[in-house]
Amino acid sequence: ECRYWLGGCSKTGDCCEHLSCSPKWHWCVWDGTF
């Protein structure tokens, strides 16, 4: 189950499509893709 926007994460693979894990805050942020 993937994490949605601003969901807690430890790596980008934790996040849903088009999201990446912020290394600074450890939550999922938009990666700029559609």
Curated annotation (Swiss-Prot):
Q: Which cysteines are joined by disulfide bonds?
A: C2-C16, C9-C21, C15-C28
Superkingdom of the organism of origin: Eukaryota
Q: In which tissues is it expressed?
A: Expressed by the venom gland.
State the InterPro entries in the record.
Huwentoxin-1
Q: What is the effect of changing S20V?
A: 4.6-fold increase in ability to inhibit Nav1.2/SCN2A, and no change in ability to inhibit both Nav1.5/SNC5A and Nav1.7/SCN9A
Main localization, broad class: secreted
In alphabetical order, the GO MF annotations are: ion channel inhibitor activity; sodium channel regulator activity; toxin activity
Q: Which UniProt keywords apply?
A: Disulfide bond, Ion channel impairing toxin, Knottin, Neurotoxin, Secreted, Toxin, Voltage-gated sodium channel impairing toxin
GO CC terms on record? extracellular region
Q: Where in the cell is it found?
A: Secreted
Misc. remarks from the entry: Negative results: the recombinant toxin does not show or very weak activity on Nav1.5/SCN5A (IC(50)>10 uM).
What remark about domains does the record contain? The presence of a 'disulfide through disulfide knot' structurally defines this protein as a knottin.
The name this protein carries in UniProt is Beta/mu-theraphotoxin-Pe1b
